[in-house]
Amino acid sequence: IKGSTLLSLDMGLLEAGARVVAVEKDARLVEALGELFRDQPQVTVVHADALKTDLGELLRAHGAGGTQGAAAPECKVAANLPYSITSPLLVHILESDLPVERIVVMVQREVAERLVAPPGTKEYGALTVAVQYRARVELAGRVPPAVFVPAPTVWSEIVVLFPREERLAALEVHQHLIELMDEG
């Protein structure tokens, strides 16, 4: 599964032989990507809001890596995330039942620093705990503003997250804790 906003990412995944399920919120981009990849049977473009979508169900529905409707196969997530949704989307993916082997994302450098921050540093906070509880996080490379058009004012970083195997079992415990806190 991947965010579809960076066309070079789509092309690189296809060249590597990947089956791609691209999730895009913007209807105009969905139409353009559908047209661009109409002759590529290994690409499915889905018009959806990744923050509000059951990603495991989406993967099962579109038969990525197997027969439509079959159990979702283990997958990789690759995205150049809009900076405004980075934190909630990473937590959404890690809290989902999506069988993720690895998540590779490009994020704002300051967010990357928060994702890998050790306890006791100023970068360490709620996002750090939420993500590190569910995944091992590694920095994979820094990306300068000059590679983008138009160039942003911030640097980006490629981050790789390896979801912890025990995260799915922990989700049930986590849900019970949330329910207890909500009850007051």
Task: Cite the ranges covered by each PLM segment.
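Catalytic cores of RNA-modifying enzymes
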Residues: 1-183
